[in-house]
Amino acid sequence: MAQNSMPVQASGYKSIWDTPLAKGVKFAGTIIDRNWEESFISRIANTSILQDLTKCAQMIQFKRPPQAGPWRPYELNQTLITDQPTQDSFCITICGSAYKSLKIDKEDIRRACDDWPEFEQGFLDDSWRQFENLLHYSLLGRMQLSVGSRNLGARAGRDGNINLGTLTSALHLSPDNILNFFTRMKMVLQQAGRWYEGEMFMVVPEEMSVLLLETMFAKQLCCNMSESLLFKGLVATNILGFTIIESQRLRPTIDRQTNRLVYPILAGWNEAYAFTADIVDADLVEMERSFGVLYKMLGVYGGGVIYPEALTKAYVTFSTAGLVPNP
């Protein structure tokens, strides 16, 4: 009986892998991936207090400290007025969810041979990076919406006399006033009673680094600032007590009156906002009606503000940034 053999294509080759086109090809590894932003979540939010919440719609309750009320002046023989201590609470719910579903044909796995483990690890790593990218946008967006009403705008601060800029009237930062800007942000948090040395952060757009470098060199030329505590090396990582975190996720808007990009800048205490996220389910399933396998992953994320008065936000433009052309 004739031996079984693979079907031969009209070209005379059993598969494209046997053609001269495929001969001599050597695998040289994978090119360098794009420059993904390093995760900063744990540096700007409390990621441990909600750690036990791993399912969508789970809720955790926080109690605010009890209030006893102010002391009253005493007069001889007066009838005492009593106060009753009060306490309220608030809840944070984990309500965000997202999934990733990837189909891989078994034939692709066989053809990949020894390269399959690297390929598999590559798309699993990228799936996590894409999830983390979603978390960055969600966290920064929600934190900006959670800033206390006295800690933003043109009338910020305890007395309403600190200007942090608005979308339509942003602060224009230059080497002449950049240090004053950091002082304003710090003062707002100090007046709110939420300044904790060594635990404060400031998330700035990457465009801020250009202004900081220009400021550093300008002051060195005029004032010999080489030993300044504000700038060490070419990157400022701590300014006036703020740990500086650069992020691409602070999206600007355009002020059409000036044609400048207006950026939000977020600062505060790293315990002010609670946030958690996790991939809670991951399965590898063989698909029906096809020779394929399905990678399924489900992630949940969410959080909420605990101390809104411990966050502050400003709107700024940069003298080192160019103008946006008219539409």
Please identify what each model-predicted range represents:
Residues 58-60, 100, 198-200, 240, ...:
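Structural beta-strand/beta-sheet cores of well-ordered domains, especially the beta-sheet scaffolds
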Residues 66, 204-208, 299:
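Short, flexible loop/turn elements at secondary-structure junctions
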Residues 70-73, 112, 211-214, 304-306:
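Short helix/loop capping segments that flank catalytic or ligand/cofactor-binding pockets
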Residues 89, 94-118, 142, 175-219:
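Structured, hydrophobic secondary-structure cores that serve as assembly/anchoring elements
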Residues 2-45, 53, 159-180, 214-327:
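Sequence/fold signature of self-assembling virion shell proteins
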Residues 106-190, 313-327:
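Alpha-helical scaffold segments that mediate packing/assembly in large oligomeric complexes
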Residues 32-99:
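Assembly/oligomerization interface modules of large self-assembling protein complexes
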